[in-house]
Amino acid sequence: MRAEKRKKKKKILYTIIALIGIFVLSTGSYAYYLWHKAASTVANIHENINKSKKRDSAVDIDNHDPFSVLLMGVDERDGDKGRADSLIYMTVNPKTKTTEMVSIPRDTYTEIIGKGKMDKINHSYAFGGVQMTVDTVENFLDVPVDYFIKVNMESFKDVVDTLGGITVNSTFAFNYDGYSFGKGEITLNGKEALAYTRMRKEDPNGDFGRQNRQRQVIEGIINKGANISSITKFGDMFKVIENNVKTNLTFDDMWDIQSGYKEARSKVIQHELKGDGTKINGIYYYKADESSLSDITAELKESLNK
């Protein structure tokens, strides 16, 4: 099933890049400082991965080639390497003016590439970091991963507090981790925002509902961040980004995407990976429906080849 959603706030890739792009595109008396600080920050968060074996040649952003990106929300804490609790695969095609995306449930049962075993897909990060996660997602969806952006979910609270709080629209009221969240428009501080993104067992949509709340928080951060006027807050944001974000996108890549791929925001298509929950040796897993997975793979490949 495909649900088409017009641009407005459903620009998941662009919200992540815009977290840095806000600084890149800033104007005013300190624009020169921000430009160089942004470039320095991107250089510090850069992390290479192997070129996809599913690509004959590398993607050319300058030529406006369609590309893919894997968004990884990692729940890392002190003394714990963490797991990839949010995996969103996206294709971006400026020629068809379309961005396509699929959220992969964290409990999805699949082969962990490089580990030689079947397990939950989010365990791939704990076993082998970014590279093993990328390899596993490529194998599961049978599509290339050109770029990745990894964000430590713990950093949400630091970002939100730096911005002075954010506003989200909760679809239902619930309690979690000592916090109460009402239905409708609510304002969150850092710790509240983190708790808001973590609850899933009481959500009628399970992990899909949790992923939606994560996107709400990201969008709230961008909306608030777009109005930053204090150079002190800019400095604090750069520090948070350096400590909590990794990507193989370069500063030039980000600039080219912001300027050359704008039309790909015209239409966002979100695919739903159907499946069922099951238990194997007493452990819960999400088993993707083979027909649904095959259809999504075909759609993603078509998006990358147009």
Curated annotation (Swiss-Prot):
Q: How does it sit in the membrane?
A: Single-pass type II membrane protein
Entry similarity comment:
Belongs to the LytR/CpsA/Psr (LCP) family.
Q: Where in the cell is it found?
A: Cell membrane
GO MF, one term, reads: phosphotransferase activity, for other substituted phosphate groups
Name of protein: Polyisoprenyl-teichoic acid--peptidoglycan teichoic acid transferase TagU
Extracellular compartment segments = 33-306
Part of which pathway?
A: Cell wall biogenesis
Q: Which UniProt keywords apply?
A: Cell membrane, Cell wall biogenesis/degradation, Membrane, Signal-anchor, Transferase, Transmembrane, Transmembrane helix
Gene Ontology biological-process annotations? cell wall assembly
Q: Function, please?
A: May catalyze the final step in cell wall teichoic acid biosynthesis, the transfer of the anionic cell wall polymers (APs) from their lipid-linked precursor to the cell wall peptidoglycan (PG).
Q: Which InterPro entries match?
A: LytR/CpsA/Psr_CW_biosynth, LytR_CpsA_psr, TagU
Note the Gene3D superfamilies from the entry.
Answer: LCP protein
Q: Which residues cross the membrane?
A: 12-32
Q: What is its EC number?
A: 2.7.8.-
Q: Which residues lie on this side of the membrane: Cytoplasmic?
A: 1-11
Q: Quote the cellular component terms of the Gene Ontology held in the record.
A: plasma membrane
Traced from the root, the source organism's taxonomic lineage reads: Bacteria, Bacillati, Bacillota, Bacilli, Bacillales
> Which EC class is this protein assigned?
transferase
